[in-house]
């Protein structure tokens, strides 16, 4: 049996051949370059064939392919929804790969499922049966592993963490992405900084924030972290609020699921990884006391590769599970 892991993102698709112990044999990356709909699926199957060719895998050999997508993989319909890929509202990716790659078994999962499986296979949560991966980037999502199994839910939407209710009363601005995401994702941090800066300037208080040097509508989380490092008052207020919310959200996970480990990753947890100790301190104020003492918080050990290794783990763990259940 040969295992393939495919990590599909919004701008590129990466893939690798894996051994059963999740050791990576070889990998390749192809750029989407504006492709949409069926063209993206074609690129995924092309990558599978490139990997199999480079690995000199015979066509008649059995293959298990794990794919992680930037959206929701619907297990009941075998389709996926990826908002950043035009034409992928209910796209039959699984069936297209299975038809294009002979003798293959294909499993498609959301990226947050891949992240937690990657960390449990090779990262800071290696060997854990109960672990949470909180992915903070443009949005916020979570992969949840309990008693050795990833949770999916009725509609495969488990882990839509951005909608956690953390700050009453309700505000209409949270309609599109939720309360938590509006404050503590990359997009949310930029949005809150813009709001604070506008309020400062409208009050006639100019020259008080480093962020004034930027065009307000072009401010991103990168500029906010840059300002934070310069002890900017606007950035400090926004980042401190995000830290509080990361801690509260983690506390909710700890109290609900009693995990061994909570892992923070995603694009934002390069600059934010230094705050993990503060996040744990905040979580300790809110979480069930016994559970939080048994739990450790870590930044991801696979910041740029969790999806790829997780995709390999999707193939390996699902194949082993199905084999054991036969």
Question: Predicted segment positions?
Answer:
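A charged helix-plus-loop insertion that forms the helical arch/lid used to bind
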Residues: 78-89
């Amino acid at each position: 049996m040969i295992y393939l892991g495919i990590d599909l993102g919004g701008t590129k698709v990466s893939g690798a051949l894996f051994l059963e112990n999740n050791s990576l044999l070889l990998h390749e990356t192809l750029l989407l370059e504006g492709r949409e709909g069926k063209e993206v699926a074609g690129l995924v199957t092309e990558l599978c064939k490139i990997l199999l060719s480079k690995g000199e895998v015979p066509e008649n050999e059995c293959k298990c392919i794990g794919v992680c997508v930037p959206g929701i993989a619907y297990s009941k319909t075998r389709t996926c929804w990826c908002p950043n890929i035009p034409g992928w509202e209910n796209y039959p990716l699984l069936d297209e790969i299975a038809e294009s790659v002979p003798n293959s078994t294909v499993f498609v999962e959301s990226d947050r499922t891949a992240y937690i499986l990657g960390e449990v296979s090779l990262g800071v949560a290696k060997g854990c049966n109960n672990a949470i991966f909180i992915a903070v980037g443009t949005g916020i999502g979570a992969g949840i592993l309990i008693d050795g199994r990833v949770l999916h839910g009725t509609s495969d939407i488990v882990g839509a963490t951005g909608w956690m209710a953390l700050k009453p009363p309700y505000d209409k601005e949270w309609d599109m992405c939720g309360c938590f995401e509006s404050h503590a994702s990359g997009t949310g941090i930029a949005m809150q900084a813009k709001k604070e800066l506008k309020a400062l300037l409208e009050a006639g208080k100019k020259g008080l924030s480093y962020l004034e040097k930027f065009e307000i509508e072009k401010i991103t989380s990168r500029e906010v972290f840059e300002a934070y490092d310069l002890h900017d008052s606007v950035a400090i207020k926004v980042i401190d609020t995000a830290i509080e919310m990361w801690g509260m959200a983690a506390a909710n996970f700890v109290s609900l699921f009693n995990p061994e480990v909570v892992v923070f990753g995603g694009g934002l947890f390069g600059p934010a990884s230094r705050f993990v100790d503060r996040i744990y301190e905040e979580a300790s104020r809110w979480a069930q006391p016994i559970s939080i003492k048994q739990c450790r918080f870590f930044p991801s050990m696979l910041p740029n590769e969790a999806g790829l290794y997780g995709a390999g783990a999707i193939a390996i763990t699902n194949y082993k599970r199905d084999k054991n259940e036969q």
